[in-house]
Regions:
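Peripheral interaction segments used for macromolecular assembly
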Residues: 1-136
Length: 136
């Protein structure tokens, strides 16, 4: 099954030279630090604003952002794997992603279990989605 068959609606356009990602770990040169609180930072895709960070985790192989995207997608909270972050600008409180808004919007949903997004099958599906889309 191709990524386009697996995720209805096809895959949106993205940055042509996007690097391979490790979805659930912060990129080493992103500017992430466990001492910095990212709550309230703006999340920006390559083509515009996604929303504001409600939660950021820093667990090995399980790091992600929970983004309030209600202004963009009515009633939506999105989970963005930390590996999609290209750089964090602490002075402007912006987190920049390596993909488009449409790629984030079209991602398979990740449902919380006990308030955390740790459901392994859903996380694996989300990781496959981003790896397939970003490796094109």
């Amino acid at each position: 099954m191709t990524p386009n068959e697996q995720y209805s609606g096809g895959l949106p356009p993205l940055v042509p030279s996007a690097p391979a990602i490790d979805p659930w770990n912060w990129p080493p040169d992103s500017g992430w630090s466990p001492q910095r609180n990212l709550i309230g930072y703006h999340v920006k895709a390559t083509d515009g604003n996604v929303g504001k960070i409600d939660m950021a985790t820093h667990a090995q192989d399980a790091s992600y952002l929970v983004v309030d995207a209600r202004r963009w997608i009515f009633g939506s909270t999105l989970v963005v794997p930390a590996g999609l972050v290209s750089v964090i600008d602490h002075s402007e409180q912006n987190v920049y992603l390596i993909c488009t808004k449409e790629l984030v919007k079209s991602a398979p949903p990740l449902k919380p279990v006990d308030g955390k997004f740790t459901n392994r099958p859903d996380r694996d599906k989300l990781a496959r989605y981003y790896r397939a889309a970003l490796s094109r």
